[in-house]
């Protein structure tokens, strides 16, 4: 009996050190677009992007924003060569992306 308990304890330790990443089954109909996929169903979503703008881009605590011009965030992060100029920016307070930037995931734009 002691061996069975010890064996079960060892199995539970082995399984508890694994992290599995995947989609959760839920009844949500909320879908979002990620960098790599479109229409991914999520359990909880909150839109945190600003929809209006007053035309001013301010520094926050003296740190300027990163204005991506014709690059998308995905193109910048995933290595579109047209976005290489932004790789050397040491810091930024927030990121500014145009609505439909020319240089996205595909190269050339």
UniProtKB/Swiss-Prot annotation:
Please outline how this chain is modified post-translation. In natural infection, inactive HA is matured into HA1 and HA2 outside the cell by one or more trypsin-like, arginine-specific endoprotease secreted by the bronchial epithelial cells. One identified protease that may be involved in this process is secreted in lungs by club cells.
Q: Which organism is this entry from?
A: Influenza A virus (strain A/Shearwater/Australia/1975 H5N3)
Q: How does it assemble?
A: Homotrimer of disulfide-linked HA1-HA2.
**What else does the entry mention about this protein?**
Major glycoprotein, comprises over 80% of the envelope proteins present in virus particle. The extent of infection into host organism is determined by HA. Influenza viruses bud from the apical surface of polarized epithelial cells (e.g. bronchial epithelial cells) into lumen of lungs and are therefore usually pneumotropic. The reason is that HA is cleaved by tryptase clara which is restricted to lungs. However, HAs of H5 and H7 pantropic avian viruses subtypes can be cleaved by furin and subtilisin-type enzymes, allowing the virus to grow in other organs than lungs.
Where it sits in the cell: the answer is:
Virion membrane; Host apical cell membrane
> Which key words tag this protein in UniProt?
Clathrin- and caveolin-independent endocytosis of virus by host, Clathrin-mediated endocytosis of virus by host, Disulfide bond, Fusion of virus membrane with host endosomal membrane, Fusion of virus membrane with host membrane, Glycoprotein, Hemagglutinin, Host cell membrane, Host membrane, Host-virus interaction, Lipoprotein, Membrane, Palmitate, Signal, Transmembrane, Viral attachment to host cell, Viral envelope protein, Viral penetration into host cytoplasm, Virion, Virus endocytosis by host, Virus entry into host cell
Q: What is its main location?
A: virion
Q: Which residues are glycosylated?
A: 26-27, 39
Q: What is this protein called?
A: Hemagglutinin
Q: Which is a Gene Ontology cellular component entry for this protein? A: membrane
Concerning its family, UniProt says:
Belongs to the influenza viruses hemagglutinin family.
Gene Ontology BP term (one): clathrin-dependent endocytosis of virus by host cell
Signal peptide location: 1-16
An example of a GO molecular function for this protein is:
host cell surface receptor binding
